């Protein structure tokens, strides 16, 4: 495997900040805050985002964003494909002309512009692998061939490869990644933002809906006698939504609860027409609204399962919920065990609606004392082991290493 070229570190003046180019095929915020979270926590560096197209509706996002092909998000497939093809070279040239000290690509898919810019400028290239982009064979046809081409380019051109879980690092190794350049880098969540309700201990659910949130009240969030089982994510079979609705429906008569599904996806239309009365579909929500639901939930259920050759690599929503003091019920699959507090949440090895229903039943039967203890353990574990703070420290060390600092970065995959 050819070694990527790395530009020799150049002396940094006191006034000049290290420039980091964040690159990604497309950028949608919400929900993909992960691509920007580390930048917001490292203001000592100069950041610029380069993408084919972006759709950012959150006003708190202030990083400069360069779009090479805005039409790449067109709903019309021919227009979208044409814009993507035109935008690849434009994106590469834009990154190169900015003269970054480090290029950080999120997802190996659509990595060709970043790989090309790193080759042109000599800047070190960091590639974070997030899931399906690391698999050696996934899907068929032209799309699969395109993904494979990008994956090979990223594996060969990256100075450092970062996998979001140990599970995904193993997938990448089987796909041909160089163990010497591959590290596990957990993305982490902001435990100062994802918190239990102010003034309440983890595990204590508020009884009142904040003023102005009439939709929450109308959907039953202010009924403390009816516990909420919460799901947040894409409404798809990969996320196990079909199993969750089945398990919840078989349980609700003997263990009353409300199942709240936050998000959108391919299963949404059928769920809207056929979901039982105790199931609420909210659609996509802003982060603040997601946090409100988490603070009211008894548990978060995220039964992701193997689908079409892939498994969930990490699942930041698991960390967000636990940081809010909400234990998790999930299948033991992919990187999920790495995202749950040991002994505080429930993971079932049997991936069936019956097993899931039993786990949800057990969680809803916890006493107030046990629930509070588990909630506190969940939050403490996320804060100590999976916080954004710790993740930023690791990534800062990687950047410093690549630009000449003696600080060490993440552990190599071969050492774990």
Where are these regions (language model features)?
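Nucleotide-activated donor-binding/catalytic signature segment of Leloir-type glycosyltransferases, i.e.
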Residues: 269-291
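Acidic donor-binding loop of glycosyltransferase active sites
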Residues: 295-310, 326
């Amino acid at each position: 495997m050819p070694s990527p070229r790395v530009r020799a570190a150049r002396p940094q003046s006191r006034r000049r900040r290290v420039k980091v180019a964040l690159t990604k095929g497309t950028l949608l915020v919400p929900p993909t805050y992960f691509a920007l979270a580390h930048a917001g926590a490292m203001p000592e560096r100069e950041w610029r985002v380069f993408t084919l197209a972006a759709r950012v509706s959150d006003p708190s996002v202030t990083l400069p964003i360069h779009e090479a092909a805005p039409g790449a998000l067109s709903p019309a497939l021919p227009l979208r494909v044409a814009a993507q093809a035109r935008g690849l070279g434009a994106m590469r040239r834009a990154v190169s002309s900015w003269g970054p000290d480090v290029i950080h690509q999120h997802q190996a898919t659509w990595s060709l512009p970043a790989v090309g810019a790193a080759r042109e400028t000599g800047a070190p290239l960091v590639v974070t692998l997030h899931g399906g982009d690391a698999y050696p064979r996934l899907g068929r046809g032209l799309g699969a061939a395109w993904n494979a081409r990008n994956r090979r380019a990223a594996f060969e051109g990256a100075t450092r490869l970062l996998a979001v879980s140990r599970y995904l690092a193993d997938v990448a190794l089987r796909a041909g990644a160089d163990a010497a350049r591959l590290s596990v880098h957990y993305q982490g969540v902001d435990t100062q933002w994802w918190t239990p309700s102010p003034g309440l201990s983890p595990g204590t659910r508020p009884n009142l809906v904040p003023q102005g949130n009439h939709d929450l009240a109308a959907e039953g969030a202010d009924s403390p006698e009816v516990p909420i089982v919460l799901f947040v994510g894409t409404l798809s079979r990969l996320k196990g939504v079909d199993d969750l609705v089945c398990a919840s429906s078989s349980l609700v008569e003997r263990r009353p609860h409300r199942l709240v599904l936050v998000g959108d996806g391919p299963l949404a239309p059928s769920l809207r027409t056929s979901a039982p009365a105790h199931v609420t579909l909210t659609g996509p929500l802003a982060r603040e609204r997601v946090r409100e639901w988490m603070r009211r939930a008894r548990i978060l259920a995220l039964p992701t399962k193997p689908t079409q050759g892939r498994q969930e690599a990490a699942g930041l929503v698991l960390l967000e919920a636990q940081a809010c003091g909400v234990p998790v019920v999930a299948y033991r699959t992919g990187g999920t065990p790495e995202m749950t507090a040991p002994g505080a949440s429930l993971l079932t090895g049997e991936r069936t609606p019956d097993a899931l229903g039993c786990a949800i039943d057990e969680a809803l039967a916890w006493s107030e004392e046990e629930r509070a203890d588990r909630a506190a353990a969940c939050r403490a574990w996320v804060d100590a082991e999976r916080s954004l703070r710790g993740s930023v420290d690791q990534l800062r060390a990687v950047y410093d290493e690549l630009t000449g600092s003696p600080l060490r970065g993440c552990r190599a995959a071969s050492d774990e």
